[in-house]
Amino acid sequence: MLNNNDIWSKVPPILCYCCASILMTVVNKFVVSGAHFSMNFLLLCIQSTVCVVCVATVKKFGIISFRSFDMQDAKAWFPISFLLVTVIYTGSKSLQFLSIPVYTIFKNLTIILIAYGEVIWFGGRVTALTFVSFIFMVISSMIAAWSDVSSGLSGSVPATIAGAVRGLNVGYFWMLVNCLTSAAYVLAMRKRIKVTGFSDWDSMFYNNLLSIPVLAIFSIVVEDWGLENLGRNFPAETRSFLLTAIAFSGAAAVGISYTTAWCVRTTSSTTYSMVGALNKLPVAASGMLFFGDAVTFGSVSAVGVGFFAGIVYAVAKNNQKKTEGRLQADAIIPLASRKP
């Protein structure tokens, strides 16, 4: 039985994880929602640089530890970092065109892709209850898309309908690419971690460090670095605040990694997955609160169904873990029962 002190000791890491997750999503949405913002690669390069500086600083104070830079490890990990660049870039482009509730709900589809990827490449298993949660995830995404299109077109004059539809189509394209690359990143990283033996902090350090040159090159080659475009992306009246927000979002990435490890260590992976499912509700609500995302029956229903799907998924994974644990225990033959 847990006493009150044990219960209350688990509250801070859970709250910190939720706050870090909400802050990161809201700040990223704020940065990319500028009327003329187009320098996503530069944004991500700054975030990764801040992240590496923060992690190195925290390591220097002895709060965390991870292995020092090694060229062989870097070569082995570079494909994973490149995949991460595509994940973060497509995610930022999705947020640029889609509302936070829609983005949050559609991220659930990545779980389905990862689950069946694990079935194909790692001998994973999808239980009946897990499949039910997947059905609800798909339904919530369909409701979100319907609500998003309806609210985007309602009240639009005929001349602007084509532009609204085009913007939504671009947003859903980036969301699809983001789901595919996110699943590929997670599955490839799982395989690579077994080869390199990386810890969570090792992965974070190498991911961000190796992504900096890639992002910098893409930014220089693809993006317009002319003074006029820089002025549009970083207006003089909001430049300081915008750069501070970008730096803060990079630090928030470190916060999410730390609070994730803290939450899993002080509670359990099951509690963490449940918190992640429940946290989708305040993340979606933050978009409605801070960015004026449409609060309609469809949008609220989509968030509710997605919220329920997350809970069902967390329960399904918990049950599956317990079942697999029992099967492993049953497979162990006691020494006293073995025949000579």
UniProtKB/Swiss-Prot annotation:
Residues 1-6, 58-77, 123-125, 189-202, 262-271, 316-340 are cytoplasmic. Keywords: Cytoplasmic vesicle, Endoplasmic reticulum, Golgi apparatus, Membrane, Sugar transport, Transmembrane, Transmembrane helix, Transport. Residues 28-36, 99-101, 147-167, 224-240, 293-294 are lumenal. It is a multi-pass membrane protein. Homooligomer. Involved in the import of GDP-mannose from the cytoplasm into the Golgi lumen. Belongs to the TPT transporter family. SLC35D subfamily. This is GDP-mannose transporter.
